[in-house]
A protein has these predicted regions:
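N-terminal export signals and maturation junctions of secreted/periplasmic proteins
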Residues: 1-5
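A generic alpha-helix structural signal
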Residues: 22, 45, 101-104
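Short secondary-structure junctions
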Residues: 24-26
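Short, contiguous alpha-helical
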Residues: 8-12, 19, 29-83, 128-174
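Acidic/histidine-rich alpha-helical segments that form the ligand environment
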Residues: 81-125, 142-147
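A non-catalytic, amphipathic alpha-helix used as a structural packing/dimerization or gating element
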Residues: 9-17, 102-106, 110-113, 153
Length: 174
């Protein structure tokens, strides 16, 4: 297995974990901010959409036209960006849970399709140009590696939100 294939598989596995969490919480609870937290399920999912686009598409191969057709990129970057944001929740009048689910799947499909056409040769090349310094990566390998690690980090937050809303932790293999 090549390094790019390994990274792609890790991104797929992390998303499978997120998809399990998504399937376990009713959509009517996605916008509730549990007591003693600052976030809701919907914001976390929106954040994962823009993060995967950023870490695994934009800085790897540049802005992707397919992504722009699926999500309002500029709006979502403002609403769901996690770097220094003061708000980690979103209201239902902005976007519905079903739309977020669909967009989560669509951006992931674009990501995997995009990565499937790449080889290990690109991994240690500089990131595609962006107007600010990438928060953790200097090259494409580091960005792709961070993508799945970041997704698993937020899986823990999503799991805690879900638990605080009365839906217990369910491990993958019972």
């Amino acid at each position: 297995m090549s390094k790019i294939e390994f990274l792609r598989e890790q991104i797929i596995e992390a998303r499978n974990f997120v998809n399990r969490l998504v399937s376990e919480l009713p959509e009517d609870l996605w916008f509730v901010i549990p007591e003693n937290t600052d976030s809701n399920f919907a914001w976390q999912i929106g954040h994962l959409i823009v993060a995967q686009n950023f870490h695994a598409i934009t800085v790897i191969t540049g802005l992707n036209e397919k992504v722009k057709q699926v999500i309002p990129l500029a709006q979502y970057n403002k609403q769901f960006n996690g770097m220094g944001t003061l708000h980690r929740s979103i209201k239902e009048d902005v976007v519905t849970a079903s739309v977020l689910k669909s967009q989560l799947d669509a951006v992931h499909e674009i990501c995997i399709e995009n990565l499937s056409g790449l080889s290990d040769d690109i991994l240690y090349t500089p990131l595609e140009p962006i107007p600010f310094r990438h928060p953790v990566a200097e090259n494409k390998y580091e960005a792709l590696s961070w993508c799945f690690k970041h997704e698993m980090w937020h899986s823990a937050e999503v799991e805690e939100i879900k638990r605080r809303l009365g839906y217990p932790i369910i491990w993958m293999n019972k």
